[in-house]
């Protein structure tokens, strides 16, 4: 009796899934039919395509499907350049892809993301690599993740447009790479940054290479939702820093991981160099300003403090100079990454600032002596100025 009940339940589930899939396919057909009627003149600009989608469709699901349909149908895979993948080029123009009507994974993903975000479907381009069955692909890959309604789904418009067989590209639309759940997608795609697995228990790179799609460490909970919120509030540089930490903790398992992390660290160093140069230039400007103020003060002191200023006003002149030099030193102390040439420049500038501070101290001591000696005389000047 129990076996019979189980069989009935299984059959019911299969029928339900079949009906659900059939209904989904019918919805796809309806959306696809409308999307493929877009005037050709509108298909050479991502904004024009987005405008058409916004007019014809209202739900996020239909909009996402419309984009997937048009890209997989209209963009050819650039087989000749399949190995010319630049994961770190953020200047890939969607309109250039639309003009040529061909591209590799980065072009597909960037085009999808560009249009999706323009129609109000939050989308990110994700980079990583893939596997088919037990074979890990030795080329990096790019795909998308979209927030459709209230859930995150994985979308791979490149794989959805066709496949390679016997060194030939076969154009064949595949709906299996549209709106995939994260726990299913991880079986074939792993992002460099574990954040983009969208799993509370992300698998490691090593587990992926071993054919695992479920983490063995269920004690290590990862709150990807909160981490994503932090990511979205970060500057591009802080995103690099936090991403590099997550990537290292997830493991480096092949040259693709190493190459990706090396590139991130290189960009971090480039940023530090740029910031250090800006800090140095700012410090140099503060130093020049301080020297100008110091020379102005010395000229004033050499004229026996004429025209008259009160004791507190004169002391404030020296204090302002001290603050300016110290600001320059503070800028230099913020330096993170030093090249040998910049390190030498910073050393020389620090030396010059400290020498200027020594001179400033001498001027302060001279002022203290002068104010003490000329106290009665300055009181007379003060009284005459008040009259």
Model regions: which residues?
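Alpha-helical and coiled-coil interaction segments, frequently adjacent to or embedded
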Residues: 165-387
């Amino acid at each position: 009796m129990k076996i019979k009940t189980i069989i009935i339940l299984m059959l019911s589930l299969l029928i339900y899934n079949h009906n659900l899939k059939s209904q989904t396919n019918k919805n796809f057909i309806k959306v696809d039919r409308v999307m493929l009627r877009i005037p050709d003149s509108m298909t050479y600009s991502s904004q024009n395509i987005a405008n058409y989608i916004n007019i014809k469709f209202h739900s996020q699901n239909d909009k996402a499907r419309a984009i997937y349909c048009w890209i997989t149908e209209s963009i050819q895979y650039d087989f000749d350049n399949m190995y010319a993948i630049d994961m770190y080029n953020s200047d890939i123009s969607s309109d250039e892809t639309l003009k040529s009507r061909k591209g590799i994974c980065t072009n597909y993903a960037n085009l999808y993301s560009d249009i999706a975000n323009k129609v109000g479907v939050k989308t990110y381009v994700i980079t990583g690599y893939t596997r088919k069955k037990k074979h890990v692909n030795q080329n990096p890959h790019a795909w998308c993740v979209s927030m459709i309604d209230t859930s995150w789904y994985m979308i791979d418009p490149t794989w959805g447009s066709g496949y390679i067989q016997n060194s030939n590209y076969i154009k064949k639309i595949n709906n299996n790479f549209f709106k995939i759940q994260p726990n299913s997608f991880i079986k074939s795609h792993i992002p460099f940054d574990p954040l983009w697995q969208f799993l509370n228990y992300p698998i490691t790179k090593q587990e992926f290479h071993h054919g695992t799609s479920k983490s063995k460490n269920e004690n290590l909970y990862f709150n990807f939702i909160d981490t994503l919120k932090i990511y979205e509030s970060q500057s591009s540089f802080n995103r690099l820093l936090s991403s590099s930490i997550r990537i290292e903790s997830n493991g480096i398992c092949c040259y693709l991981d190493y190459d990706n992390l090396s590139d991130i660290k290189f960009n971090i160093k480039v940023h530090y160099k740029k910031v250090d140069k800006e800090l140095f230039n700012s410090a140099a400007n503060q130093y020049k300003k301080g020297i100008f103020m110091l020379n102005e003060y010395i000229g004033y002191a050499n004229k026996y403090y004429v025209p008259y200023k009160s004791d507190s006003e004169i002391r404030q002149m020296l204090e302002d100079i001290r603050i300016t030099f110290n600001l320059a030193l503070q800028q230099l102390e913020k330096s993170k990454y030093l090249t040998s040439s910049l390190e030498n420049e910073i050393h020389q500038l620090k030396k010059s600032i400290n020498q200027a501070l020594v001179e400033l101290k001498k001027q302060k001591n001279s002022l203290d002596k002068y104010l003490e000696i000329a106290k009665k005389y300055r009181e007379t000047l003060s009284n005459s100025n008040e009259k």
